[in-house]
Amino acid sequence: MFKESPIIRRVSRQIMVGNVPVGGDAPITVQSMTNTLTTDVAATVAQIKALEAVGADIVRVSVPTMDAAEAFREIKKQVNVPLVADIHFDYRIALKVAEYGVDCLRINPGNIGNENRIRSVVECARDNNIPIRIGVNGGSLEKDIQEKYTEPTPEALLESAMRHVDILDRLNFNEFKVSVKASDVFLAVESYKLLAKQIDNPLHLGITEAGGLRSGSVKSSVGLGLLLAQGIGDTIRISLAADPIEEIKVGFDILKSLKLRSRGINLIACPSCSRQEFDVVSTVNALEQRIEDIMTPMDVSIIGCIVNGPGEAMVSDLGLTGSSKKSGYYLDGIRQKERFDNTDLVDQLEQRIRAKARSMSERLDEKNKIDILTKD
């Protein structure tokens, strides 16, 4: 098994979104977007804090009006995670939230207006040390680009992005990242591949308007997986018509599956068949809910029989292999004398997983202390 990802990431510049680095050798960040009314400060703050609690590195907030900008001011005071203001149509809103300490400005080339307006936003961003995201979307391209290509194409999205990259370059502004999102997987993937060849700025990945929880997760996993596996991407957002918390979970699961960022339990489980010695599906479903709060990276295998069970368990931090009445238990790849009663697996597994997580976390903390002392 690969313990580390074989993926070689594309070389990119690094920018700072608040205190979070994006690009360069920084970990790929996972972000989401609030779906509350921004003018409802209490609801928006509560959702941002919930997103932060499940691991969101960055949160984007829509700011469609000046009233929303005033609400954003209050929201920013009450949260710790870096906030991106999502700006469309009225560039003056970007200028206003810049005064209120926004950590990044997202502007849409398709509707932000002419170069003079962009210049105003850039100058304000520079004065306040705020990065910008050029956020191209296949559904809102500039009118002349729509007329030129008649429909969204990779070349159309690239032209829109490069038009605004060139503007920022002429203004000698380098603190920006770029996205070229589309709801079609192939369109998005090809657009990002073209863009990655043209610039070295950080890339924000996403399949826009991907769909509901199941279908959107699949589309996003396929699209982002294709790009990330080629080393493309510095920050990701999973766009789902679902609770934004699910976007963070899916985002981390994608990175975990590619070994690009480890966080939480990597649960390896068989789909079950007539050979299973215990109810694998119900065990895994119950266990997932019990251990989703554990952040320590760990491989746990739950296999219902002895065909693949021992092999998976031997390369896992903790493994269970189904056997009649009592199942075999492995720790660090070594079979233990202890066996688990098949009628009480979830409680037993949760206890062992939590104990193992504590042990691994303590070892990691000790290693980090040694590394710091060595560097000093």
Swiss-Prot record:
It catalyses: (2E)-4-hydroxy-3-methylbut-2-enyl diphosphate + oxidized [flavodoxin] + H2O + 2 H(+) = 2-C-methyl-D-erythritol 2,4-cyclic diphosphate + reduced [flavodoxin]. [4Fe-4S] cluster binds at C270, C273, C305, E312. InterPro entries: Dihydropteroate_synth-like_sf, Enolase-like_C_sf, IspG_bac, IspG_bac-typ, NO2/SO3_Rdtase_4Fe4S_sf. Keywords: 4Fe-4S, Iron, Iron-sulfur, Isoprene biosynthesis, Metal-binding, Oxidoreductase. GO terms for biological process: isopentenyl diphosphate biosynthetic process, methylerythritol 4-phosphate pathway; terpenoid biosynthetic process. Its cofactor is [4Fe-4S] cluster. The keyword Transcription regulation does not apply. Binds 1 [4Fe-4S] cluster. Its EC number is 1.17.7.3. GO terms for molecular function: 4 iron, 4 sulfur cluster binding; 4-hydroxy-3-methylbut-2-en-1-yl diphosphate synthase activity (ferredoxin); 4-hydroxy-3-methylbut-2-enyl-diphosphate synthase activity (flavodoxin); iron ion binding. Pfam families: GcpE. Pathway: Isoprenoid biosynthesis; isopentenyl diphosphate biosynthesis via DXP pathway; isopentenyl diphosphate from 1-deoxy-D-xylulose 5-phosphate: step 5/6. The keyword Hydrolase does not apply. It comes from the Bacteria. Belongs to the IspG family. NCBIfam families: ispG_gcpE, PRK00366.1. PANTHER family: 4-HYDROXY-3-METHYLBUT-2-EN-1-YL DIPHOSPHATE SYNTHASE (PTHR30454), 4-HYDROXY-3-METHYLBUT-2-EN-1-YL DIPHOSPHATE SYNTHASE (FERREDOXIN), CHLOROPLASTIC (PTHR30454:SF0). Converts 2C-methyl-D-erythritol 2,4-cyclodiphosphate (ME-2,4cPP) into 1-hydroxy-2-methyl-2-(E)-butenyl 4-diphosphate. This is 4-hydroxy-3-methylbut-2-en-1-yl diphosphate synthase (flavodoxin). The gene is ispG.
